[in-house]
């Protein structure tokens, strides 16, 4: 069942008024592939635009807080925790992991996915002048906890 469609097939924001407030968490990831020289430049702090990981981290945090402004039917949420981590993996990839949490009436999956996506886009933006071959790949939900649908972990059947 698609919860954002009414009986006539019209899109609407889901009414969560009567739902209990529960602890909810979500974790998402994104990967960015680049030339080894680009990753080395980032790691050594020699990028002309500054600390790429720090800027991407802040962009991801800001994006999570603005998810409802970007995705039309998302509820505005009072997130109580947002964490965005970037790490070099191998010689040519960066892994971005975003975690969001709150005590509320709706989940935070879209916030975590938005944080990871915007952090990846920011990394791309900051590095495109030195590497036109950047590739953003595998943006996905890793884990979701809380709420009516319970616990989900990537790789598990729904």
Curated annotation (Swiss-Prot):
Pathway: Cofactor biosynthesis; molybdopterin biosynthesis. One of its GO terms (molecular function) is cyclic pyranopterin monophosphate synthase activity. InterPro entries: MoaC, MoaC_bact/euk, MoaC_sf, MoCo_biosynth_MoaA/MoaC, Mopterin_CF_biosynth-C_dom. One of its GO terms (biological process) is Mo-molybdopterin cofactor biosynthetic process. Substrate binds at residues 73-75, 110-111. CDD domains: MoaC_PE. It catalyses: (8S)-3',8-cyclo-7,8-dihydroguanosine 5'-triphosphate = cyclic pyranopterin phosphate + diphosphate. The active site is at 125. Catalyzes the conversion of (8S)-3',8-cyclo-7,8-dihydroguanosine 5'-triphosphate to cyclic pyranopterin monophosphate (cPMP). Belongs to the MoaC family. Homohexamer; trimer of dimers. This is Cyclic pyranopterin monophosphate synthase. It comes from Azotobacter vinelandii (strain DJ / ATCC BAA-1303). The lineage of its organism: Bacteria, Pseudomonadati, Pseudomonadota, Gammaproteobacteria, Pseudomonadales. The gene is moaC.
């Amino acid at each position: 069942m698609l919860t954002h469609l009414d009986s006539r097939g019209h899109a609407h924001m889901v009414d969560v008024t009567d739902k209990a407030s529960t602890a909810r968490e979500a974790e998402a990831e994104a990967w960015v592939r680049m030339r080894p020289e680009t990753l080395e430049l980032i790691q050594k702090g020699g990028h002309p635009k500054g600390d790429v990981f720090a800027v991407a981290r802040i962009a991801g945090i800001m994006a999570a807080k603005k998810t409802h402004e970007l995705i039309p039917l998302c509820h505005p949420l009072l997130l109580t925790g947002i964490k965005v981590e970037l790490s070099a993996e191998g010689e040519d990839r960066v892994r971005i992991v975003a975690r969001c949490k709150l005590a509320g009436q709706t989940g935070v999956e879209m916030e975590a996915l938005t944080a990871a996506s915007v952090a990846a886009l920011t990394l791309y933006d900051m590095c495109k002048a030195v590497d036109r071959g950047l590739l953003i790949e595998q943006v996905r939900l890793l884990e979701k906890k809380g709420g009516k649908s319970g616990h989900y972990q990537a790789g598990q059947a729904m």
